[in-house]
Amino acid sequence: MAGKTVTNGAAQGKAARSGADGAVRGKAGMGRVDLIGAGPGDPELLTLRALRLLQQADVVVHDRLVSDEVMACIPAHVRRIPVGKAAGFHPVPQEQINALLVELGLSGLTVARLKGGDPTIFGRGGEEFEAVTRAGIPCDYVPGITAAQGAAVSARFPLTHRGLATGLRHVTGHRARDAALDLDWASLADPQTTLAIYMGAANMAEIARELIRHGMPADLPVLAVSQASTPQEQRLHATLQDIAAALARKPLPAPVLFIVGHVAAMAEDCALPQELYRPEWRLVAHG
């Protein structure tokens, strides 16, 4: 990959601590920080604004989930600082990322903070926005296609569909350390609402059990997707009652997105029993 970058965990921390002391020098006066959504991985799903800002940046501070294909859109001369996290592995703590963005912005640099998906959906973009703007640095959000949309488009099915799903909810399946999953199970257990569950692989058995206990059909279709829209994409189909066991038999690379709902049976490669399509609803859906 072209450009100046650092890849291992210890070096990531060092790169972040070094802040604006690298080769790129800031312009006179205040810089700016843009929190940019990289989308699910396919570079063609970047917005035009995201692409323009990446090409105009002095430095790109990027997450682990940004694909190599998207990173290749960054000009070779632009400095890159990796600050990615993985489950249980945070070489650069969030507070340090916030401080780095402030330091770079105060140095007069044009900073692209590049995040997988959309920075406003489970991306901690709000925390970074608050830190940057509190320091008086101009900052904007640049939306990206979130993982749920990327998965749906890649597998060729809708997230809502007349007669099948009248709503969509984005939910985190991740729990804080030693804490319970703090979810409103009763409101989530609505078969007419598609659930997009992020970061839930480790807790999917509990999630499925609680949804079923609160009234969600046990045979509701579920699609698990890893690295949606990229050449490395992997999918797994199951029912709600079977998804945890299916994932144990065939683990997918993290992070895994789960689409729970009748629309999941409309995915192009779904081999679930035909009765799960609820044909009486599909007649209504296709009107």
Swiss-Prot record:
Do the record's keywords include Transferase? yes
Q: Which GO terms label this protein's molecular function in UniProt?
A: uroporphyrin-III C-methyltransferase activity
Keywords, alphabetical: Methyltransferase, Porphyrin biosynthesis, S-adenosyl-L-methionine, Transferase
Q: Where is this region: Disordered?
A: 1-24
Q: Where does S-adenosyl-L-methionine bind?
A: P40, G116, G117, D118, T146, M199
Report the catalytic activity.
Answer: uroporphyrinogen III + 2 S-adenosyl-L-methionine = precorrin-2 + 2 S-adenosyl-L-homocysteine + H(+)
Q: Name one GO biological process term.
A: siroheme biosynthetic process
Where does this protein act, in terms of pathway?
Porphyrin-containing compound metabolism; siroheme biosynthesis; precorrin-2 from uroporphyrinogen III: step 1/1
Q: Where is the signal peptide?
A: none
Q: Where is the composition biased (Polar residues)?
A: 1-10
Looking up InterPro entries in the UniProt record yields: 4pyrrol_Mease, 4pyrrol_Methylase_sf, 4pyrrole_Mease_sub1, 4pyrrole_Mease_sub2, CobA/CysG_C, Siro_Cobalamin_biosynth, Uropor_MeTrfase_CS
Which Enzyme Commission number(s) are listed?
Answer: 2.1.1.107
Question: Briefly, what is this protein's role?
Answer: Inactivation of uroporphyrinogen-III methyltransferase results in the loss of nitrite and nitric oxide reductase activities, but not of nitrous oxide reductase activity. Likely involved in heme D1 biosynthesis.
Protein family according to the UniProt entry: Belongs to the precorrin methyltransferase family.
Q: What is this protein called?
A: Uroporphyrinogen-III C-methyltransferase
Q: Which organism is it from?
A: Paracoccus denitrificans (strain Pd 1222)
